[in-house]
Amino acid sequence: MTIGVIGGSGIYEALPLENTHTETVTTPYGDPSDDVTLGELAGKEVAFLPRHGEDHQHTPTDAQYRANIYALKSVGVDRVISTNAVGSLREDLPPQTLVIPDQIYDRTKHRSPTFFGDGIVVHMGFAEPYCPEMVEHLADAAAAVTDAETKTERGGTYVCIEGPQYSTRAESEFYRSQGWDVVGMTTIPEAKLAREAELSYATVAGITDYDVWKQDNEVTLEEVLENAAANQDSINAVIERAIRTMPEDFESDAWSALEGTINTPTEAIPAETRERVDLLAGEYLD
């Protein structure tokens, strides 16, 4: 088992990893956001990758989602814990609350959501966008390590917007009218790509603000960064607990997600495309 972690540098610095080393990974989808750091925690292999780069130089649109997921797959990762900063769409989910969402609404516009195409067509089910087993595991970890002052929410819908601008008030009010729970910029296409790569994937979302639906409320970078920093210790504790308690007999339907989804005969797939997707789909193309 190798557990991938996608998030900010604060997570890597806080996790008590041993025997660490970095690997520079090249992929058919470009360079990842940064090198992959590998180490051990509680006898488990861990691979860490900062989504936005070490110095947060990639916007939510420009983050190297395909290369990042491919890189984690290539170093042996089979499950991924990610972290996100999000705004709250509910009065009862204040800043500094942790949410383990189980649904996504995709409002992104300019991101490639698939590894496939160019001669290979894959239609994959995505009804449960986060791995249900990983959602439960993260929610249990959050319940175990947070105190009475840190609210945690099990389940909920994450609406993913393109960014990098925050929502308009009309957009924020619309999201609330749909009954959605949090709004952020980074879980898509990450969750879709993780499923295509047959990785068990879920996220810990830390609430930084109330978005702009509240009267006279504006989202500012200062507020977001302040609350993101306040959330960091709780998120770190959840991730460490989740890694330490990850069961050896953990099972996920995501690990066979490509089965029966490839709609192109193997002999019709261009050789260059087949080589590009071999790590992801090779066993289904033999």
State each model region's role.
Residues 1-127, 285-286:
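Metabolite-binding pocket within alpha/beta catalytic cores that recognizes anionic/polar moieties
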Residues 73-76, 176, 195:
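Non-catalytic positions within long, well-ordered alpha-helices that form the structural scaffold/packing
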Residues 141-181:
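Active-site/ligand-binding-proximal alpha/beta "capping" segment
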Residues 251-286:
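A short, charged, Gly/Pro-tolerant segment at domain boundaries
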Residues 185-222:
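Zn-dependent metallopeptidase/amidohydrolase metal-coordination segment
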Residues 133, 137-149, 234-245:
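Generic non-transmembrane alpha-helical segments
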Residues 212-257:
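His/Asp/Glu-rich mid-to-C-terminal helical/loop segments that flank catalytic regions of hydrolases
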